[in-house]
């Protein structure tokens, strides 16, 4: 089961370590820019500005979290974030990150989009988000 974590940091850094650690580490959310493992070089990733220090919950999905009726794994994005004190009509953000070579960006763009759509559909199917939630998808 995935754990919900909370932060009020002014900046959140969503980083995909998968390629750089040969899958030892995966996606992580940090409040300070992390370094590429075993270097002093900062990792690239998604930076979310939280200037008002809103309390934000976030969940990083594991590889076995999403399954269809037959128990088969369905594609999904990396994580979601939402206000800690959210209500039925609040926003939710789904994120998919690919740490890839520039030549692969065009290929991964459609894959990312498909993963985001699949995750959002699954959340709606299981009534985890309603039609009144404002949904953001970030690649």
What are the residue ranges of the model-derived segments?
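Short acidic, S/G/P-rich loop/turn micro-motifs used as interaction or catalytic elements
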Residues: 71, 100-104
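Basic, amphipathic N-terminal segments that precede the first structured/catalytic domain
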Residues: 1-72
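A contiguous catalytic/ligand-binding core that recognizes phosphate-bearing ligands
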Residues: 64-67, 80, 102
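Conserved catalytic cores of phosphodiester-cleaving nucleases, focusing on short active-site segments
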Residues: 79-81, 91-100
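Histone-fold modules and their flanking histone-like tails across chromatin and transcription assemblies
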Residues: 39, 69-89
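Catalytic cores of nucleic-acid endonucleases
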Residues: 106-139
């Amino acid at each position: 089961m995935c754990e919900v974590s909370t932060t009020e940091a002014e900046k959140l850094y969503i980083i995909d370590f998968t390629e750089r650690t040969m899958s030892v580490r995966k996606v992580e959310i940090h409040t300070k820019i992390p370094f590429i493992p075993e270097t002093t070089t900062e990792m690239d990733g998604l930076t979310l500005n939280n200037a008002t220090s809103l309390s934000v919950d976030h969940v990083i999905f594991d590889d076995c979290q999403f399954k269809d009726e037959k128990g088969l794994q369905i594609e999904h994005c990396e994580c979601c974030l939402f206000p800690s004190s959210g209500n039925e009509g609040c926003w939710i953000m789904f994120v998919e990150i690919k740490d890839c070579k520039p030549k692969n960006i065009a290929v991964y763009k459609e894959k990312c989009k498909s993963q985001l759509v699949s995750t959002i559909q699954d959340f709606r199917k299981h009534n985890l988000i309603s039609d009144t939630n404002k949904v953001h998808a970030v690649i």
